[in-house]
Design a protein with these regions (language model features):
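Phosphate-/nucleic-acid-contacting segments
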Residues: 135-188
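Cyclic nucleotide-binding regulatory module and flanking cytosolic helices
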Residues: 1-25, 69-70, 74-75
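Short aromatic/basic micro-patch
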Residues: 20, 63, 94
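Cyclic nucleotide-binding regulatory domains
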Residues: 27-88
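A short hydrophobic beta-strand segment most commonly corresponding to one strand
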Residues: 90-99
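A small-molecule sensor/coupling module
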Residues: 98-136, 140
Length: 188
């Protein structure tokens, strides 16, 4: 049901779009403090929402890939609260924020789909916060596996998994190697 609502929501958003934009890897879609004029639906690629910390670190607030609305929390803000940075080459549907606001006021189906989408994003954020609070790679991986009943992704997706749980790819590979050795020793 949520997936159907999400598809309908994304189609509706695409219908409100005034254009599709492309961004090269490393390019900013917007910066903290910029006026919020548009929301973006990521079609291809990955965008990170980041905040630069006083100590020089970068906090990744959101990892938006295909089918994710970028900076949805800014729909009722006058300025962006973070930077949107393309991690890879990105194609995104751009929608004037005024059209989103109008649709929320005038279309109850859209408003319900939007609320459902935000609820899902909040659950995902809580999951990421829980995983990030764990100290070891093993604990983070276990938590990710518990949240995602699909099991370990294919080898080609391990770098994205490492990014998702906030560890280096090398640390994840070492943990997976330990588990593989453990599986062989235990006969599983």
């Amino acid at each position: 049901m949520i997936e159907i609502m999400s598809d309908t929501l994304m189609d509706y958003i695409r219908g409100l779009s005034t254009r599709r934009k492309t961004f090269g890897a490393g390019q900013d879609l917007f910066n903290q403090g910029d006026d919020v004029e548009s929301l973006y639906l990521v079609e291809v690629g990955v965008v990170h929402l980041v905040r630069h910390q006083a100590n020089g670190n970068i906090a990744v607030l959101q990892r938006a890939s295909s089918g994710v609305i970028l900076a949805e929390a800014s729909v009722f803000s006058s300025v962006y609260h973070c930077d949107g940075v393309a991690v890879s080459d990105v194609s995104a549907t751009s929608v004037p924020v005024q059209l989103i606001r109008r649709a929320l006021r005038s279309n109850s189906d859209f408003a319900e789909g939007w609320a459902s989408y935000l609820s899902n994003q909040l659950q995902q954020t809580r999951k990421r916060a829980e995983i990030a609070s764990l100290k070891t790679v093993a604990a983070r991986l276990e938590s990710w596996l518990a949240w995602n009943d699909v099991g370990l992704p294919s080898k080609g997706e391990w770098k994205a998994l490492a990014d998702d749980i906030g560890v280096s790819p090398e640390a994840l590979y070492r943990e997976l190697s330990k588990r593989r050795i453990s599986f062989v020793r235990n006969g599983t």
